[in-house]
C-alpha cells in the first residue's frame, strides 16, 4: 500500500465513520500512518427512525464499537436540515421534471465534503478529513492535487465524487482507495473490528433498502398513464413516469405480449407532455441509442477542465465501461460530447464524468441527447 505522506505526526484527521467496514479500516490505517484520528458520525435523515429499513441507530452503534476498539473519540452531528435543503429537495425537483437524478453525488458535494468539512474545521480543528471512498489523491510537484480512480476497479467511486473542488480534494484523505475490497475486509478481520463482515450498504443514501416506488410516492403524486410501443400501440399502463428510467427492463408489467418476438422490453423514452412511457424490444433499440449528449452544470476538479477537442473517456453511469469521446465547448457551462460509437440508455439528469487515464477530471449533468 502507498503511504499518503512521508510523515503525519500531530496532523489531526476527522474520519467520517459510517458504521461500515471501509470507514473503520480508514481510521485504522490513518492511525498506523501517525495521524491523530477522531471519528465523526453523521445523521442525515430524520424520518422513519422506527422504520425496519432505517439502520442509523445500528450504524452508530457499530461506529462506536469500532472507535472504542481503536481507542479514538467518536463525535456525532446532525445534518438533516442541510440534507433536506440541499439534497432531497433537488432530488424531488429533478424527478418532478422527468429526469433521473443521482442524489448520492449531491450528498457528497453538499454534505460529506462541505457540511462535514466545515464542521471538522470549525468545531473539531481538523487538518484533514477522511472518508472510506474507493478513490485516490495525488499530490503533484507543482502544488496541485488530483483525484484518481480507486485501485479496485469494481469499487472505484470517483464517479460519485467528481463535484469536489481542488481544495476539497487537497483536504481529504482516502486510505482504502489504495486497496482492493477483499484486502480491506482482511485488515478489519485481523484487527478484530466488528464491521469486518458487515455487508455493503445499497440503495440511495436516504432511502436505504426501502422500495423506491413506495418512498417516492410519499412525496410526489403519481400520475398513471399509458405504455406505448415506439410505433404508438398502447400495450399497458404505468403508475407514474417518475418511477421509470431509460434502459429500464424490469418492473414494466408487459411480459408475454402477443405479436412480439422474445426480446425483452426496455424503456426507450418518456413523453412528458402526453404522460406516456415509450418501450421497445431489445437493449439496442434505435430509440435507446445516442451518438452523443449535451452536458451542462460543468465542474472541473482542477478548475480549468480538458482542452477543446480533447479525446478522453466518459462514464454516463456508475460502473459503466469507459466510453471514448470527443469534447466541444458550446459555452463556459455547456459541453457537446460525441461518442466514438453509439451508446445505449444515456439518461438526462444523470452525471457524465470524464477521465484522462486514471485521473478524474470532473463532469456535469446530462441535459440532452444527440441522436441520428
From Swiss-Prot:
- The ranges of region (Interaction with target base in tRNA) come to 102-104
InterPro entries noted in UniProt = MnmA-like, MnmA-like_C, MnmA-like_central, MnmA-like_central_sf, Rossmann-like_a/b/a_fold
Residues engaged in binding ATP:
16-23, 42, 132
Question: A GO term (biological process) for this protein?
Answer: tRNA wobble position uridine thiolation
What UniProt keywords are attached to this protein's entry? ATP-binding, Cytoplasm, Disulfide bond, Nucleotide-binding, RNA-binding, Transferase, tRNA processing, tRNA-binding
- SUPFAM superfamilies named among the record's database cross-references: Adenine nucleotide alpha hydrolases-like
Protein's UniProt name: tRNA-specific 2-thiouridylase MnmA
- Which organism was this protein described from? Shewanella sp. (strain MR-4)
Q: Which gene encodes it?
A: mnmA
